[in-house]
């Protein structure tokens, strides 16, 4: 009897987990030293975010890791109001000699507001969680998720382009 109950609970727990995290990852080689990749990564962060020091959570040059915690605000207009959803995400930059890795993950909604009212915090997923969990219909949900994914994809692509560009010319200007 215990085994049957355990099996039922085990199977149900897998079905109850609804959030499927958005993940972007790339590992590639570039003709740059670890130090140059690190410097270029810090420069990219400074150019991409308004306050680079406030988003950097971990910065270890020796280990070749820079970890940032970013935020994104997505607006969608429906029911005659502007609904504002705020999301957090983590970007990890790893670097070695002639090699880098970028990883974007831990994307989640931490706030949903419409005026003074709090809306449900929705899962970030490629599948519609239902009206009760999303607080909006399927079409609006996918519009919001696509806008969020496009923003994160743009950051991902910008970094790859930035880090792959050749080493800047001489500093004698």
Language model: regions and residue ranges:
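Bacterial Sec-dependent N-terminal signal peptides
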Residues: 1-22
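Ser/Thr-rich, low-complexity intrinsically disordered terminal regions
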Residues: 16-173
């Amino acid at each position: 009897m215990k085994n049957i109950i355990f099996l039922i609970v085990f199977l149900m727990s897998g079905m109850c987990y609804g959030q499927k995290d958005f993940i972007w990852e790339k590992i590639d080689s570039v003709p740059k030293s670890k130090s140059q990749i690190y410097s270029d990564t810090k420069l990219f962060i400074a150019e991409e975010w308004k306050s680079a020091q406030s988003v950097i959570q971990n910065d270890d040059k020796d280990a070749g890791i820079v970890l940032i915690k970013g935020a994104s605000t997505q607006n969608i207009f429906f029911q005659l109001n502007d609904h504002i959803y705020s999301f957090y995400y983590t970007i990890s930059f790893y670097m070695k000699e002639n090699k880098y890795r970028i990883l974007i993950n831990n994307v989640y909604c931490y706030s949903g507001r419409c005026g003074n009212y709090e809306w449900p915090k929705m899962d970030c997923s490629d599948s519609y969680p239902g009206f009760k969990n999303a607080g909006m219909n399927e079409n609006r949900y996918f519009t919001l998720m696509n806008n969020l994914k496009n923003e994160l994809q743009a950051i991902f692509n910008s970094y790859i382009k930035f880090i792959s560009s050749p080493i800047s010319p001489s500093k004698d200007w």
